[in-house]
Amino acid sequence: MSDNSSNQFLLLLAAAQQQQQQQLLQQQLAKIQKATASSPSKSTNGTSASTSAVPSTSGTSSSQNEAAQLQNLAKMQQIQQLAQFGALMAAQKKQQEKAAADKAKEKEKEKQKAAAAAAAAAAKASASTSSASAIPGLSPEMLAAWQQAIQMQALQQMMMTPQKSQMEEAIKKMMDMAKKKPAGVASTSSASTSSSTPSTSSASITSSNNNAANNAASNMMNNVMWQLVAAQMQQKQQQQQKDTQKKADQAKKAKELAKQQQKEQDVKNKQQEEILKFLMAQHQLNHQKKHEKKQADAAALAAKVLAAHRAALESDSPEEGKKTNEAMLRLPLQLGWRRQTCVRSIASAGVKGDVSYFAPCGKKLSTYSEVVRYLTKNSIHYITRDNFLFNTKLVIGEFIVPKQTEADETQQEREFAMFTEDDINKELTRLNVLKFVPKIQASTSNGVHEDDIKMSKIEEPDEPLDPSELNDEFTEELVHSQIMSNGVDECKIREREADDLLVNINDVRHLPDFSRIGNQCLSSQGFADALMVHEFVQNFGHVLGIDLEIAPKLESLCAGLDGDANHAEQTLQLTRQLLRLALEFPGMGNEKRFGQGGGEMGLDRENFSEVMRLFLIDKGKRGEELSQPLLTCNFLSISPEQKASILAFLCDELVCSRNVVTEIDKNLDEISRLKGEKWMREGKARALRSARSKKKNDEKVVVVKEEQNHESDSEPPTRPDTPKKATVAPPTVVSVSPVSAAQQQQRKFTPGLGQCEVLTEQEESMSLQQMDSLIGDLHQEAQNINQKIHDTGLKIRSFPFGTDRFHRNYWMLAHTDKVIIESLATTSVNNPACNANEYASKDPPTLEQRVPGACETIDLDVIACVEDLVDDVVLLRAKADKKTRKRYRRIENHMKRGWWTMQNRDCVESLRSCMLSRGIRERALHRLLTKPWFLNELKFGTITIEPVGEKSDLELVRRQGWTRLNTAIDKLQCHLKMSDVSKPLPSITPFETQKPIVVPPTMALAQIVKDDMAWKVIDEEVDGQELDETIIRQKIIETADMVQPKFWRPKFQKLEDQDTCQLFEDWKSYVSTEAQTTSQLMVALQTLEGMIMWERSSREALCQICKSMDGDEMLVCDGCESGCHMECFRPRMTKVPEGDWFCQRCREEKSGRPMCMFCSRETGNLHQCQRCAYHVHQECSQDGPKEAINPETFICGHCQEMKQMRFVKRLILRSESEERELEDDNHAENGENTKNGHMNGMNGAIAIGVHNQQNGVKGNLKRKLEVPSIGGLPKNMNKELCQLMLDELVVQANALPFLEPVNPKLVPGYKMIISKPMDLKTIRQKNEKLIYETPEDFAEDIELMFANCRQFNIDHSEIGRAGISLHKFFQKRWKQLKYNFTKRLRRLHR
């Protein structure tokens, strides 16, 4: 049910109730009117019937009383209704006032009081009107008030109902009562009328009239009531709408207010959060500022100390150094420390006494050890031991002077007075003044002797001291009296020193335990040698031609030395490179056991160990000791420590190498240059500081002068100067003598190192801030240069930067980025003071000697524990006989051997805190570890050696060595059979006995020398089958027996009066019994090959002019079987001479006259070459312009070229591994062509010789060498060939004019003469673009370049001579490279 419907029901209920009450009132009024109407009739009829009036009078009076009571009751009901109406009106107003939230409570109370008063007044007024009206009917005003009261009563009931359901029930009950009441009323009214009718006879008439009147009145009242109800309902609806709107507005305002309050609350919360965050940030910022301020203060103090140290180091004058030291010593006093000196005596030389320091907490410190201990305990880092001084050289702090009292002279009781620095300085000044004043003998008239003078009473220190009192106080008597107590003082000093020693002994802290090097597989000495090899290779490998990317690192090197299969090959390659370099320089001696020195042999995989042994034997006693293990086994089979020692020895030998010495000299020059740069910057900084201080002083003088001028201007002009102002010194003006001025002018214009101390005009005109900035920049540059000096110095030499109590060295190396600590086992091998034999007579190596390899995995700490147990037993036995007792170890066993590293900077701090300040070694190390610049250079970390996994199978390596040796013997025998050096066999055909055509040069054993990949520990391509050593030895001797005696060199040839050659027999004995390893047998086999004169063989003939076998055609002498290229003659020989041909040497021997080896003429000015002993003409041996020849030092051009070619050949053999010969796996007995290109070429050469013989041409007269030809080279190989030729051309000394294209601006007319310019740069660009398809295309451009040179330049010009020399080199070298690449291509095609 809605609010409107409920209001309508309430109004209807109120109207029904009001109607019922009206009916009741009308009935009562009708009764009253009847009563009033009957009273006059009775009075008029009373005269006629007087006798019967008595009973009627009594009835009338009773009816009047009832009417009065009914009127009073009606009036009371009206008054009650009016009161209820007033109460309802007050309640409604009160609710309206409560709904208005914007009105104040005080106004609400006043309105409630006013409403209550108005209601009471209305009730009184209504009562008075009702009581005053004696009319029996209702007035319209009362009727309207009554209607309003009835309505307000219904409204009050509606408002007082708490719930909706209860209100509906109440409405239903009231409706039912309204329906029942009219019937009851009607019955009562009818009863009353019926009862009253018998009373009078006229009542029926009156009642009918009254009923009509009552009906009319009731109808009128109903109409008025319904009008009032409609108007009231309309007003109520309007009021409800207003209230609803008002409530909606209030709810909206309340929501807006709530939102606004919520927003305000959120804003407040945000503000509170921001304030809280701000407070927290402010607190954190304050805390951070305090921390930063604390750090800044500590940094400032440290900077101040560091600046004082630096100023002390940089100060040139002693005065500045003294001031700086004094400032450093005053720093603790500024921080709250006290320095107190107990004075024993004062003289002109200074103060003597005992110095003590008092910390801020009050603790007294009397020695350096106590100070250091206190600083370490309290973590004070901004001051150090250097800020304290326990002698009295400087007058700093407080001074306590003892004095004697005059009260009791016998007991010599002493009191003390406190003196300040100023007092002591005044006294010292007085004594120094008195020292130079002539002494005046004191008057003795008073009878007092000088010795009897007593020391006067010392006044308070605040008062000025009287010089006479001080003179009396510190007289010679005081000194004399103190002499008596010198003995006591000396005893106290000794006791104090003993106490200090005891304190130091008791407070000795154990050094921290550093981390050992992980997976240590070498002994201490072995790791030391490996570390030295690693540093040497990393430092000088780039100048020795060692590839540092391939070279093993320290971890891999140690594992490879221990025999790890994964790293053994890298170690073997490094060993080979070091040995090869050592053989080149410093080389070996000239001792030759079998006619051939070790340096003359090639270095290959098999003779490696024996060549190394021969090299070590040649290097003195140390080398002989290292070579002993190689006498019975190969290099790979010796112990890791022996390998490391040999590698270290090779590095020591290479230090004297030319390249290493040059690198060291270059580094020394670089250090000298850097020191000069640093000195110049420091000198410039000193000059700037001096100029800055001078400018600052000048500015101060100018300010003082301006102030003086201002004061003088303010004074009267007639006033004379006072003596005080007259004594004021004018601005300081340095008087410069003419000599010094001339020197300064000369320094300004004289360049050199002194120039850095001379400022330019621009520098002198700088401001103080600019000077400070420039000084800072110079200081930073000096520090950077100092770092470079340090890094460069590490490349030259490395020294340990400190030693501790265990004699352990601390290393900082250039290429090991960790601090390494070396133990006693390697640092003090030759130091008798800490000899390991004195500490422990027998160390664990004895166990290793008994059981080899059993102690390899024993940890060093375990060894130390075992040694401790052994030491206890030894010490117990030593106590038996004190006379024979020996001094045993004072060093802990676990510190004796091994290597350690520092993990981080905390290790430095812990190490520094545990060091002894009085230790000889640790004091220096501690001083260095406290310097910040040194700590910044240290690098920390750990080193872990690669774990040793599977080791190489040495037995398999040994078997493969014998297999390779057997292969080499087969190769040599095959080569002997294919040449005419071996003895003839019965199966040789007649045409094979004749001289065949010469084949390309190939040495049999050279085929064993493979590229770098062949240097493997275990070669998978080599069969490791077991061979009988006796058979191998016998096979080598049989190979020697195959050589014809005429091909032996003189050392292996027997003399005419002897049956055998003794050297040859010694060689056989060496092969049979003495040689114990495959390497030694390989050297013997190479010696055998070297003793054969291969050049006497027609197939191995060398050109006597160019000393090579490369060439197109070669003529072989029919007398000595030596060969000469046809192209080497001057002029060039184009045809093969008919008949027998003899070389120049055979002709000279026959005729006895010298002959030119080029042109074969005897005439002309001949010169003998000091190298090849041939006679040549100058014009034949030299191309281009002729130079003056010194006969004593003359060397022909071919010999000079041969020397250069040998050097180039060595370079090629190092870099070009493919140019070496491959092995021949097939045997020559099978009759098949071998895989080697030389053997194929040999068969082809024999076939050519047979064909020429069948054609009737003499094979012994025509010695032609055909270059092996094959199809065109691949593009990559062609490019590589051209690139190699270009690289060799560029490095030549005469290649400078041909490196770049000719500039037409610099050389006018060049393009007019040369139509097709060409240079090496253009050729290189074309080669990189793969323009050259064949080598001939490349050679055409090279020839074009030299043709242009000959066309534009004359032969005698500098460029002409350079072109001729370079062209000649190109022609020879190009043939060799083409031949090598052709052979390589043939091997690829097989």
From Swiss-Prot:
Residues 524-588 form the DDT domain. Residues 46-63, 186-215 have a biased composition (Low complexity). Disruption phenotype: RNAi-mediated knockdown prevents age-related decline in the expression of bas-1, a serotonin (5-HT) and dopamine synthesizing enzyme (DOPA decarboxylase). RNAi-mediated knockdown improves behavioral performance in pharyngeal pumping in aged worms. Its main location: nucleus. Residues 323-395 form the MBD domain. Residues 30-67, 178-215, 235-269, 705-729, 1218-1241 are annotated as: Disordered. Residues 243-269, 705-724 have a biased composition (Basic and acidic residues). Keywords: Bromodomain, Chromosome, Metal-binding, Nucleus, Transcription, Transcription regulation, Zinc, Zinc-finger. A zinc finger (PHD-type) spans 1100-1149. It comes from the Eukaryota. Residues 1273-1377 form the Bromo domain. PROSITE patterns: BROMODOMAIN_1 (PS00633), BROMODOMAIN_2 (PS50014), DDT (PS50827), MBD (PS50982), ZF_PHD_2 (PS50016). Broadly expressed in the nervous system, including head, body and tail neurons. Chromatin reader protein, involved in positively modulating the rate of age-related behavioral deterioration. Positively modulates the level of global trimethylated 'Lys-9' of histone H3 (H3K9me3), but not of H3K9me2 or H3K9me1. May repress the expression of mitochondrial function-related genes by occupying their promoter regions, working in concert with histone methyltransferase, set-6. Involved in modulation of the mitochondrial unfolded protein response (UPR). Negatively regulates expression of bas-1, a serotonin (5-HT) and dopamine synthesizing enzyme (DOPA decarboxylase), with aging. Interacts with set-6. Belongs to the WAL family. This is Bromodomain adjacent to zinc finger domain protein 2. It comes from Caenorhabditis elegans.
